[in-house]
UniProtKB/Swiss-Prot annotation:
One of its GO terms (molecular function) is histidinol dehydrogenase activity. HAMAP family: HisD. Pathway: Amino-acid biosynthesis; L-histidine biosynthesis; L-histidine from 5-phospho-alpha-D-ribose 1-diphosphate: step 9/9. This is Histidinol dehydrogenase. Signal peptide: none annotated. Zn(2+) binds at residues 259, 262, 360, 419. One of its GO terms (biological process) is L-histidine biosynthetic process. Keywords: Amino-acid biosynthesis, Histidine biosynthesis, Metal-binding, NAD, Oxidoreductase, Zinc. It is an enzyme of class 1 (oxidoreductase). Binds 1 zinc ion per subunit. It comes from the Bacteria.
Length: 431
């Protein structure tokens, strides 16, 4: 990892230090994704089979996972893995259920009641990536809130393996959350299929899930076309750690590596006011990296990541808010005291004993989070992500008589005579 002193960097160098790797390739992928989406729209399942053969190395007769495949997956996974997923589902359910909105009603004036009612989105599409490793945890993170929201239909796409099967843990995770419509389809082509629909894949109202730069670009393109809404830009994983001199170097290094092993386009950043801590973390990175099964992938990610020395911890928070990380770890002696300084982050992890990996799997919070700086304006997935909040209002005759003049005056100011007349007629006065 590159080690930098923030106080010695120019404005341009500071911008470069916080530039994410994916941002440099977005323009290269945009045209390729647009071509692929157009092909799926035009040729449907035929295009999907050709694209799947090209990218996944398998020709599929059917994209849908059969009951027999679900049963085989159920028999294939280890009992301890099943139990771990069941435990995770319970905690994810507990956390997300506590945050559910029940709507509300308020009388804004005598005889005028305004409400918000909550309705589930009808059909949602979940994407569970498996590019460098299958991610059954993502199926849990998306399936639980979709179930709690009460969505009428939930569709899940995940890439096939070269033998035409799907990772059994992903299928069991889907079953544990009540999802049975699973399709063997990955990448931008899966996003296109769920957005526009084909003979095999139903079109969905909203799409969810993380992915590589191609998946993220595909989600943004289908959203811009109006074909389907999306949860957020959720691209390559990233973590930013703010650590003080009292942090455990081994813990910090382990947290950095846990993100670096996701993929070569992941980014990890460490901000610290301690030279000694930064040096010790670098040593730990070298030691721990040698023990990882995905060391080559992690090494590529580390090559474009940063260890940054800051003058003060306050400076670190200013940098973090500018970067708006997906994951923010506060390896500090009084982490909760610093929490008020956080303005933009997907998920925050407080203290030495809250590794980001807990949030990835089983603490209960959601791990589908905004990346690439989107945490400035987006939140992570929740039950509300799968729901619509519908406004309702009801006015009695006394109610419209009481507030109608306000509407008439505002309508006239905007030159909208019909608006004014619609109110005035009910009041029994001339507009």
């Amino acid at each position: 990892m590159n080690t930098l002193d923030w106080t010695q960097l120019t404005a341009d160098a500071r911008t470069q230090a916080l530039t994410r790797p994916v941002q440099t390739v977005a323009t290269q992928t945009r045209e390729a994704v647009a071509t692929l989406i157009a092909d799926v729209r035009a040729r449907g399942d035929v295009a999907l089979r050709e694209i799947t053969a090209r990218f996944d190395g398998v020709t599929l007769e059917s994209f849908a996972v059969s009951d027999a495949e679900f049963a085989a997956a159920d028999a294939a996974i280890a009992p301890e893995l099943r139990q771990a997923m069941q435990d995770a589902v319970a905690r994810i359910d507990t956390f997300h259920r506590a945050g559910m909105s029940e709507g509300y009603a308020v009388e804004t004036a005598p005889g005028v009641v305004c409400e918000k009612i909550v309705r589930p989105i009808g059909r949602v599409g979940l994407y569970v990536p498996a590019g460098s490793a299958p991610l059954p945890s993502t199926a849990l993170m998306l399936g639980v809130p979709a179930r709690l929201a009460g969505c009428r239909e939930v569709v899940l796409c995940t890439p096939p393996r070269k033998d035409g099967s799907v990772d059994p843990a992903v299928l069991v995770a889907a079953q544990l959350t009540g999802v049975r419509r699973v399709f063997k389809l990955g990448g931008a082509q899966a996003i296109a299929a769920m957005a526009y629909g084909t003979d095999s894949i139903p079109s969905c109202d909203k799409l969810f899930g993380p992915g590589n730069s191609f998946v993220t670009e595909a989600k943004q393109q289908v959203a811009q076309s109006g074909a389907a809404a999306i949860d957020m830009p959720a691209g390559p994983s990233e973590v930013l750690v703010i650590a003080d001199a009292g942090a455990q170097p081994a813990f910090v290094a382990a947290d950095l590596l846990s993100q670096a092993e996701h993929g070569p386009d992941s980014q990890v950043l460490l901000l610290s006011d301690s030279d000694a801590l930064i040096t010790a973390v670098q040593e730990q990175l070298d030691l721990q990296l040698a023990q990882l099964s995905r060391a080559d992938i992690a090494r590529q990610a580390l090559a474009q990541s940063r260890l940054i020395k800051v003058a003060t911890l306050q400076d670190a928070f200013e940098i973090s808010n500018r970067y708006a990380p997906e994951h923010l770890i506060l390896a500090l002696r009084e982490p909760r005291a610093w929490l008020a300084q956080v303005e933009a982050a997907g998920s925050v992890f407080l203290g030495d004993y809250t590794p980001e990996a807990l949030g990835d799997y089983c603490s209960g919070t959601n791990h589908v989070l905004p990346t690439s700086g989107a945490a400035r304006a987006y939140s992570g997935v929740s039950v509300a992500s799968f729901q619509n909040m519908v406004s309702v209002q009801a006015a009695s005759k006394a109610g419209i008589d009481g507030i109608g003049a306000c509407a008439v005056i505002l309508a006239r100011a905007e030159g909208l005579d019909a608006h004014a007349n619609a109110v005035a007629l009910r009041m029994g006065v001339a507009a």
